[in-house]
Every structure is written in C-alpha cells, then in structure tokens.
Design a protein with these regions (language model features):
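A well-structured
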Residues: 1-157
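Contiguous, non-catalytic segments that form substrate-binding/exosite surfaces or channel walls
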Residues: 98-247
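Conserved small/polar residues in nucleotide/adenosyl-binding loops
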Residues: 437-439
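Active-site recognition of the HExxH zinc-binding catalytic motif
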Residues: 249-264, 284-288
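Divalent metal-coordination and catalytic microenvironments
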Residues: 4, 140, 254, 287, ...
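Post-HExxH zinc-binding segment in Zn-dependent metallohydrolases
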Residues: 276-314
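Long, amphipathic alpha-helical stalk/connector segments used for oligomerization, subunit docking
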Residues: 299-394
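C-terminal substrate/ligand-recognition segments
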Residues: 395-412
Length: 439
C-alpha cells in the first residue's frame, strides 16, 4: 500500500496546486490572463491523468488486493479504486477542453450577472453543456450509472436520483403547499450599516477564530460568488459584501463551516482518500450547521449584534430575514423553510437537462416557470433568476442536491446535540466552542 499512497499523495498535492490556481482565478486574476490560466490548469490535469493511467499503479492495486490489509487500508483501497475508475473514465483531451471552457464561462458569467444580460454567456454555456454531456456519457459507461447519476456520484456516492427523488417528494408534498399557503413578507427590512466592510470583516474574524477557524492555516478574501477553496492546510474562504450586511455575514459563516471542516481532517490521512470529506452532502452539512444553527440562531445573534452596538434596527432585519417565511428569489438568501424549494427547482431542471438535453433558452424558461409555480415569484431580472448561481457556468451539475441533503444532516446533528441548545442559551464563544467538540 505504501507505493499506492505515494501515488495518491501526488494526486492530492496536484489537486492542491489546482485549487490555489482556481482561488486566484476567482479573486485576483486579470481578465486577459484567463487563457494562460486555463493552459496552466490543463497541463496540471494532464499530469494528474498520467498518475492513474500508468501500468504501475494498476499493478500496485493488484498487489494490495492480494495482501492482508488493516481495516483503514482496506477502506482506503476501496476508495482508491473508485477514484481511479472515475478519473480514467474521462478522455484527457475532453478534460482539457472542459477546463478551458469552464474558466471562460465563469468569467463571462460575472459580466452577464453584473449586466443582467444572459446573451453574453448563452453561446459559450451551450458549448460547455455539450462537453458536460460527453463527460457524463463517458463517466456513465465506466460506472454503470445513468449520465446524470454518474455526475451526482462525483459529489456523493451514497445517493442517486431515485433516492433523491424520494427525498424531494416530501418537499413537493409537504413543504411547497405550506409555503404557498403562508402569508409571506415580500420586502423584509434591510439594515444599513455605517461601519465599513473592512472594519466589519476585521471584527468578524475575531468571532470566526473563536469558532475554531485557524487563520494561521487559512484566510478570507472577497469574490463574485462566496466559496471555500485553497489547499491542504491552506484553506481559503471568500465572501461578497452586499447592501444587506446580514447576507454577507450569512455567506461568510457558511463558508467558514466548510473551512473548519477542511482544517480538521485527520492529519494521518491528509493525502489519502480516507482523509478527504465523506461526501459533499456531509461537507454542506457543516457549512449549513454554521450558517443555520449558529449564525442564524437568536442566541448567537446577540454576539454578532455587539459589533453593531446592539442595534434594534439590525435585530428587526435579522428576525424578518431568518425567522420569517418570505418571498425571495435568491437561494443563498432564502429562509430555512423555503430554501429546499430553491434546491428542488434546480434539481428538476438538471434532470431535464440530462433527460432531454435542453439548451440555455429552455433552461431559462423552465427556471422562470418553476419559480412562478413553486415559489409564487414572477422573475423579471436574470441576475435574480438563471444567472444567480455560479455552479452551472463552472460545469458543475449534480451538486445542487447536496445542499438540501446537507441541510437535513445539519438539522439531524443539531437534534442529536442537546448540549448545543444549553450552550446557546448562555451565548458566549467559549460555550459554543465546547458544544462543537461534541458534534
């Protein structure tokens, strides 16, 4: 197993380098440098590809299969084989084309979103869709799954569309009718802070450090779409500052949940499959735990509001945003009750994309139709509609279900951690820190 572990260490280190290049692309990369960056990431992908296509690694797999292994190594070997199958399933030339088109679309998405004009990205997105369909087809053949299920398996091996359908049937049957029947706030109060973004971030960093985010192994920056990336022991989270400071802080706590999870992976398995996240559903459960059950809790809000001199105005905005069902076209800003409906809509559209290979124009129409039927929202702005999320424009399909599954897991964690309620009843950072130890 030692030689196999060395191969996988190389694989994960190369992924780390790619992760840092991606972070730089999202935060600092000049517009005219996109082509060079896509070449850099494409070459890195080729090096990764060579690792798993070598005859030597196949021989090492066979040796390991004929060796008595520890329980940990047996599980690691199983995961290694799965990764190799998926990596080798995709043609290297297709991987390079995908990387280049993803970077192009990601930058065009920024422009299209800021100008509320999807025509800027429509052609390139349709080209990207063609490449993703080919990726899904190749992956499906290697994994004996449907094309869409093969993409879902990239993010969570424990779920496929049949299981996710059962999960979302509850949303269809129970949540959507109740949402449509509830009298909702249409325009919640928005708190306007007179504190600068940089000063708020400086004070919030103190709170995040108290929640175990290690700034000696991580950092916070700004980007067009909040995310958590970087590398092993170099976790980089981003946020964007909105007119509504609560939305910015909510996103920041969400990404901090991802970051704390990454920083607490077991050191002895950092460069093995066993030391990676269990799944993206579990990863999202950690981010949504931080967002929904810490930041959005009434008890922890008292800690946050100290920064704003215990503002009654901010408290009103907080209660209307996070403790009231309301009409909101934006997924990341949605209240906890309507949030899974937003995810459900994206899942429905993704299924249609891979069933009937619909293009951007039909995707946009389907998006608007579903928002009207399921959320009573008549969309006018494309920025608040099909352009609001970055995922599809980065070629990421099959990921959205992990948000709903993650929210479910986060709620289960909260339900099974009675100490957490006790500690939040006496809201101070030390008590919250203690409760996190028990999760």
């Amino acid at each position: 197993m030692n030689k196999l572990k060395e191969y996988f260490k190389s694989y994960y280190v190369l992924n780390d380098v790619s992760g840092l290049l991606f972070w730089d692309n999202a935060t600092n990369l000049p517009k005219k440098s996109i082509e060079s960056r896509s070449e850099q990431m494409s070459i890195l992908s080729n090096f990764t590809d060579r690792i798993f296509r070598s005859e030597d690694i196949q021989e090492e797999i066979q040796k390991a299969e004929n060796t008595k292994l520890s329980e940990a190594d047996s599980m690691s070997l199983k995961l290694m084989k799965s990764i190799i199958v998926k990596e080798n399933a995709i043609d290297p030339d297709l991987k390079s084309l995908l990387i280049k088109k993803k970077l192009t679309c990601e930058h065009l998405w920024r422009e299209a979103r800021s100008k509320n004009d999807s025509s800027i990205i429509e052609k390139d997105f349709n080209d990207l869709l063609d490449l993703v369909h080919e990726e899904a087809s190749q992956l499906a053949k290697a994994t004996n799954l449907s094309p869409y299920d093969s993409l879902i398996s990239k993010y969570d091996m424990d779920y496929d569309s049949s299981k996710i359908d059962k999960f979302f049937s509850v949303i269809e049957r129970e949540i959507i009718p109740k949402y449509l029947d509830i009298k909702k706030i249409k325009s919640p109060h928005v708190y306007k802070s007179n504190i600068s973004d940089s000063e708020i971030l400086k004070m919030i960093k103190v709170k995040l450090k108290q929640l175990n985010f290690d700034f000696d192994r991580g950092r916070i920056d700004q980007s067009h779409h909040p995310f958590c990336g970087g590398a092993t022991n170099d976790v980089r989270i981003t946020t964007r500052f909105e007119d509504n400071i609560l939305e910015s802080l909510s996103a920041l706590f969400h990404e901090t949940g991802h970051g704390v999870y990454e920083q607490n992976r077991p050191n002895e398995y950092l460069y093995e499959p066993l030391g990676q996240s269990r799944s993206l559903s579990v990863h999202e459960s950690q981010s949504l735990f931080f967002e929904n059950h810490i930041f959005k809790s009434k008890a922890y809000f008292k800690i946050i509001n100290n920064i704003f001199d215990n503002s009654k105005d901010l408290e009103k905005s907080f209660l209307e945003h996070y403790h009231t069902v309301r009409v909101n076209p934006i997924r990341v800003s949605a209240d906890e009750f309507s949030y899974p409906i937003h995810v459900y809509i994206r899942y429905k559209i993704e299924k249609e994309i891979f069933k009937n290979k619909i293009k951007f124009k039909d995707i946009k129409n389907l998006w608007n139709e579903n928002y009207l039927n399921n959320l009573s929202i008549n969309l006018i702005s494309e920025t608040e509609g099909v352009l609001q999320d970055i995922h599809w424009y980065e070629g990421i399909f099959g990921y959205f279900p992990t948000y709903a599954l993650g929210a479910m897991i986060a709620s289960q964690i909260k339900f099974n951690c009675p100490l957490f309620d006790i500690f939040l009843g006496n809201p101070n950072e030390e008590n919250i820190n203690l409760s996190l130890i028990h999760i």
